[in-house]
Amino acid sequence: MPSLDELTISTIRGLSVDAVSAANSGHPGAPLGLAPAAHVVWQKMKFNPKDPNWINRDRFVLSNGHACALLYSLLVLYKFELTVDDLKQFRQLGFKTPGHPEATDTAGVEVTTGPLGQGISNAVGIAIAQKQFAATYNKPDITLSDSYVYTFVGDGCLMEGVSSETSSLAGHLQLNNLIAFWDDNRISIDGDTAVSFTENVPDRYRAYGWNVLEVPDANTNIEAIAAAVDEAKKSTDKPTLIRLVTTIGYGSLKQGSHDVHGSPLKPDDIKQLKKSWGFKEDVDFFIPEEVSEYLAKHVSENQKVQKEWEAKLAEYKKKYPTEGAEIQRRLDGKLPEGWKEYLPKYTPADKPLATRKLSENVINALHGKIPEFIGGSADLTGSNLTRAEGSVDFQPPSTGLGNYDGVYIRYGVREHGMGAIMNGIAAFGANYKNYGGTFLNFVSYAAGALRLSALSHHPVIWVATHDSIGLGEDGPTHQPIETLAHFRAIPNLSVWRPADGNEVSAAYAAAIESTSHPSVIALTRQNLPQLEGSSIENALKGGYTLVKKDNPDVIIVSSGSEVSISVAASEELAKQGVKANVVSLPDFFTFDQQSDEYRLSVLPDGVPILSVEVMSTFGWSKYSHEQFGLNRFGASGKAADLYKYFEFTPEGIAERAQKTIKYYEGKQLLSPLDRAF
């Protein structure tokens, strides 16, 4: 007679195999190998299926997201929102069991994973957020935050560069609340890992500053797995990597081979597995009653733990009313009342400044006003201007470099890691509004994480400075050309390119208020004038008419540093007897959400429209009839010389505006916005 633990593990394996079989698609190998570890970890975790967002829950992150049949089986067994019927519809359209875990679809899924290496990196971000939240609000007599984050990672996750970036930082930051389980099954899609992955992973992680524990028989030895978890939780100054030596597809006729990784098992294989577990061979999605009762007991215990925590929170609010009210506000997802009053406002009389400097002004203005507004830079603090005056770094207290309640994170030269960590910080909850700085061109290093930000609805903020050839002498290796076109093509991503101080404040206002999409704020190195006609209110529409003439002959639509040049071009055209409106379009995403009536009032029928932006013209045809941009790489030189060389001058723009007018003269012209669908 198998023990309850053995029966539960077999049930997890059975549900996972049946889900993949029902879909005729998926990955049965990892769930078969990892089921024992999953059972042990979930029995040690504190969580409440009826309140899956409880802030002090332990988090489980499946970095090897292809093994999601395992996670879905656990969510069914512990009675989250998922049901057996959802499992039966694994990987089918319209159900909560997609082919890789999606946090927006499925309660109990902490982060969206699939691209390998992202999950462990998100877990580092969750651990950072927990540390920061705990250090900010825990008191000597009341501990409100003491949760752990557990993550399962495969060989592929550890091959990806992003996991190296974030694991290195996790070791430096001494994140002892992070426990990672490496599924060392020695198999990749190409076959045995001997063909490509032969480094000493435990030694690598020790060098990062991690504890490393090993379970050599993780297919069956749940006592050893449990002991390893207990040992990991004793750590006071290191994250822990637990090496689980497993067999992929354990028990299958094809165990230990890459054939069992990403294809359903054959019917005869499934039958022999079920027979070995003592299950009926012809019964699918079998859940023994005693397993349900066993797991329900753990849930009941956890619900008591949450009630005790809620009583502790109530006591905390009485003893520490200011902090208690702040915690409740954050848990409610609300920002501090009146925070937008601190946003800087500008007039044309104010001196020209680089928009990166104007961004710094916003960060300084909001420092201390929004406690959950935290951020950092990928080793470019002095260039990105992302550190508020008087802020404390997020660092282990033992280093003497800061404290865990610090609000500024030194990410090092780890752009991709920074992006994935930012996603984890957002996923933690507590209304974190976190930002990361680098050069715009190097946000491309983090494209994988940025795409997942948008897919996951994480309202993270990228402070992306040095946004064009205007950065000058560093040359085309650093000058973005295709970057904004790429980012604007990502669904659910707001890409701001503000033209002056009011537009910078608007970009931050929108980004901080967002609860469902990330933002990239592209900022200049060079100084720009404060514009007549700009305002936070106007910019919050994503696009607006900055220079308005009656019955214009042409409209020049632009963004960022080219807006002021376009205004000068309008003045040049006026000398030539041409009336030119100038439209500032700092964010396509926000502008597209405005009413048709408003958008057509800005970019109307009957007037030729010329777009001007000193980078790729790709995407501008949606808003203009003709496009003036830079569809080649830049060059090294002084910014002013580059703008002149590429003809991004008032005269160069005016010349192209005249050509646009001439080309469309006498032609019936609809707005580019005027479309069938």
From Swiss-Prot:
Tell me which cofactor or cofactors this protein depends on.
Mg(2+); Ca(2+); Mn(2+); Co(2+)
Q: Does the keyword Magnesium apply?
A: yes
Q: Which residues participate in thiamine diphosphate binding?
A: 66, 114-116, 156, 185, 261, 415, 442
Q: Name one Pfam family in it.
A: Transket_pyr
Recorded GO molecular functions are:
metal ion binding; transketolase activity
Q: For this protein, what reaction is catalysed?
A: D-sedoheptulose 7-phosphate + D-glyceraldehyde 3-phosphate = aldehydo-D-ribose 5-phosphate + D-xylulose 5-phosphate
Q: Which UniProt keywords apply?
A: Calcium, Magnesium, Metal-binding, Thiamine pyrophosphate, Transferase
**GO annotation, cellular component aspect:** cytosol; nucleus
Cystine pairs annotated here are none
The residues the record assigns to binding substrate are 27, 261, 356, 383, 466, 474, 525
Instruction: Look up the domain of life of the source.
Output: Eukaryota
Is Calcium one of the keywords UniProt gives this record?
yes
Entry's NCBIfam families? tktlase_bact (TIGR00232)
Family statement? Belongs to the transketolase family.
How would you summarize the oligomeric state and partners of this protein?
A: Homodimer.
Protein name, per record = Transketolase 1
Organism of derivation: Candida albicans
Organism taxonomic ancestry: Eukaryota, Fungi, Dikarya, Ascomycota, Saccharomycotina
Q: Which gene encodes it?
A: TKT1
